[in-house]
Amino acid sequence: MSNPQSIVVLGGGSWGTAVAHLLATGGHKVHLVLRSQKLADYINMHHENNIYLPGFSIHPAIHAVTGKISFLTKEPAHVLAKATIVILSVPCQSLRPVLQELEPLLTKNCILVNTAKGIEVETLKTVEQMILDEMAHRVSHYAVLSGPSFAEEVMCEKPTAVVLACRNEQLGEHLREIFSTPWFRTYSSTDVTGVELGGATKNVIAIAAGVSDGLGFGINTRVALMTRGLAETTRLGKALGASPLTFSGLSGLGDLFLTCSGELSRNRQVGLRLGKGELLKNITNSMNMIAEGIKTTYAVNTLASKLNVDMPITKAVYNVLEGVISPHEAVQKLLCRQLRNESLDETQPIWTDIP
């Protein structure tokens, strides 16, 4: 086991809670920072996150804390000042103001590990790029943890494999030891861009896969969407400097397969319900956890257009979310695209008939 660390997990959703449990199981001192005082009190008393992970026992060594208004107040500020590692488990679209609050509280060598999966809609930036904006001097101490990992299965200690990417290879190897247990295997990588993009775009493709399932199509259709979705994700990754090989790994193909086929996938559930005819507004209003793929679809579609990268499945999901076309029409549009060589790596968009 690695030396015990003082770790703060920001965000008490299902994944933040599961990561906190994982690290506490590994013998580390873990604080879980929430916004809800009621939930923090419940976790400390009952060792259960009854809102986001009901029915699962949380390691009793985890201590939940909260600030009334922001992370800068009272106990959270105290624990952050002593943290050697801070885990960012806040939804991507809400992360930037959290980073701004964090900066003055952290020690010089504090390590930031991101678990959020998305691209900021307003700026089209990844989390690493947000770190560069808000705390550039810390980017050498930044890593991202991603891969096929449902929180519920991590809580049950079912064998899981993920990847941790850090541009500092030595630091990445150090972190993979901290995040590994006999049932949770962590691989290391230096391709931060590729790992972040794989984690973000798979949620878009998962919505498409859910739409297909909701329409009553078969496994053939779902796997076709997954495979071609991986192809367009790889094209975007190459345009942004990522290694194409990363997308065949855990944060690419692995996470894509899990999210497109798993019953626990929130993004697939969004697509499934869209395919069955529900309105997007009604779907989102009924969910108590965020499906990152909705906002990510808008960001990825805009980014692809800006970079002139052909991403027809992403475009189709965007148009369904916008109500431009029906789910069934979107599938038909994809099937009626110009026939081509499978290995063709387009630099020019070839689907231009939908705005």
UniProtKB/Swiss-Prot annotation:
Descriptive protein name: Glycerol-3-phosphate dehydrogenase [NAD(P)+]
One Gene Ontology term, aspect cellular component: cytosol
Keyword set, alphabetical order: Cytoplasm, Lipid biosynthesis, Lipid metabolism, NAD, NADP, Nucleotide-binding, Oxidoreductase, Phospholipid biosynthesis, Phospholipid metabolism
GO MF entry, a single one: glycerol-3-phosphate dehydrogenase [NAD(P)+] activity
Function of the protein: Catalyzes the reduction of the glycolytic intermediate dihydroxyacetone phosphate (DHAP) to sn-glycerol 3-phosphate (G3P), the key precursor for phospholipid synthesis.
A Pfam entry, by short name: NAD_Gly3P_dh_N
Record's catalysed reaction(s): sn-glycerol 3-phosphate + NAD(+) = dihydroxyacetone phosphate + NADH + H(+); sn-glycerol 3-phosphate + NADP(+) = dihydroxyacetone phosphate + NADPH + H(+)
Record keyword Ion transport present: no
Pathway recorded for this protein: Membrane lipid metabolism; glycerophospholipid metabolism
Source lineage: Bacteria, Pseudomonadati, Thermodesulfobacteriota, Desulfovibrionia, Desulfovibrionales
Stretches that traverse the bilayer: none
Gene transcribed to yield this protein: gpsA
Active site per UniProt: 202 (proton acceptor)
Biological process annotations from GO: carbohydrate metabolic process; glycerol-3-phosphate biosynthetic process; glycerol-3-phosphate catabolic process; glycerophospholipid metabolic process; phospholipid biosynthetic process
Binding site for sn-glycerol 3-phosphate: 117, 147, 149, 202, 255, 265-267
Enzyme Commission number, as recorded: 1.1.1.94
